[in-house]
Amino acid sequence: MLWSYPEGFAYFNEFAQSIIWEPVAFSYALLISGADLLLLAALALLSGYLRRAIPMFLILGLSFFSVILLGPLADLALPHRATEILTRPHLASTEMHPGISVMALYGGLLWPLTFIVALIFALLYFSYPMHKKGGTFSFLSFGVKSEESYERLKPAMKVLAAILVPLSALWTIYPGMLFFSQTWIYAWKNWGLMLPMFFGETFITATGTALILYYLERMEDERIRYPLLQIHGAAAIALAGVLILQMFIWGMWGNPNFAAVVPMMQAAAVIFLLTFILTLVSAKYEAITPIVPVLALFGVVVNKWNLIINGQLISRAGMGVLEPELAPNWLAEAVSPIALAILLLVILSYIFPMEVEEDAA
């Protein structure tokens, strides 16, 4: 039995259909990192730390975060009904639908609110830089043509950034919250450290994609590279610790069913430990820095696949491990949202400047 939005509970035969949440859910869970990028942009503005990376954080964050509501995070079991999260949100308890739907709360209320706040924040931030850039999209300066006018906008930007921090932070644990609530999946309901695991993964994905974009854009600024490496390495070692602790907890239970997910967890933990070591080395030897985020993102892919796909293969009936049965078009479905996010990234990076002068920020 599983929850399907908006109809309610549905029943299935796990032996006829071992995989209910297809790999496309894995892609959307990756794109949640857009919320972390928006969070980093807001914190950078408020603290003054990593300020030169704010344009990159905003462009990447909006590109990723814009995509996540288009599919399975609205209804991972029945993604074709995703639009109903906006048209039929269950934000209040009714006789037909008792309680409040977490999916409706996030998709019908929190996503539009977070997106609108982030978009206004980004437009205000880029207003004067767009005037200085000129060209076709200079109208996005919204009449802000002087440093004095831009300075008057900064209090409003700080208020929006302060609002954006808690809104974005709530998204970092949303996939973990959604998976953990699926008590009909044995592995997920017993994955006690799922929320901190997702929190660490989103930071690794966010900082990893930012580091990759840093090199693709040929930026040369230690004020961006070094702090990003620090956050990236801290998230990697923390996530390795979470995975090791979770395996230790399962080991104390002595339950053989978790053998289906432990090998890939071990591999992911080793990858994240190696990532941490490489971040320390690359702080001195910059040439190896591009390897670090690629390795870390590979670890995230391994870990998410293990959680989402292998986690479903542990029988809910206690009958051992099931065989995976994926839909024929699973790869195209999994790649499409990531491709759309990359397309948005290309468009936004063409419109908005990836680097902003200090006096214009």
UniProtKB/Swiss-Prot annotation:
Q: Give the organism's phylogenetic lineage.
A: Archaea, Methanobacteriati, Methanobacteriota, Archaeoglobi, Archaeoglobales
For the keyword Plastid, the answer is: no
How does the record say this protein sits in the membrane?
Multi-pass membrane protein
**Gene Ontology cellular-component annotations:** plasma membrane
Q: Where in the cell is it found?
A: Cell membrane
| Protein keywords | Cell membrane, Membrane, Transmembrane, Transmembrane helix
Look up keyword Mitochondrion and say if it applies: no
Assembly and oligomerization = Probably composed of three subunits: TtrA, TtrB and TtrC.
Q: Where are the transmembrane segments?
A: 26-46, 53-73, 104-124, 160-180, 193-213, 233-253, 258-278, 288-308, 334-354
Function statement: Part of a membrane-bound tetrathionate reductase that catalyzes the reduction of tetrathionate to thiosulfate. TtrC probably anchors TtrA and TtrB to the external face of the cytoplasmic membrane. May transfer electrons from membrane quinol to TtrB.
Similarity field: Belongs to the NrfD family.
- Tell me where on the tree of life, at the top rank, the source sits: Archaea
User: Organism, per UniProt?
Assistant: Archaeoglobus fulgidus (strain ATCC 49558 / DSM 4304 / JCM 9628 / NBRC 100126 / VC-16)
Q: What is the protein name stated in its UniProt record?
A: Tetrathionate reductase subunit C
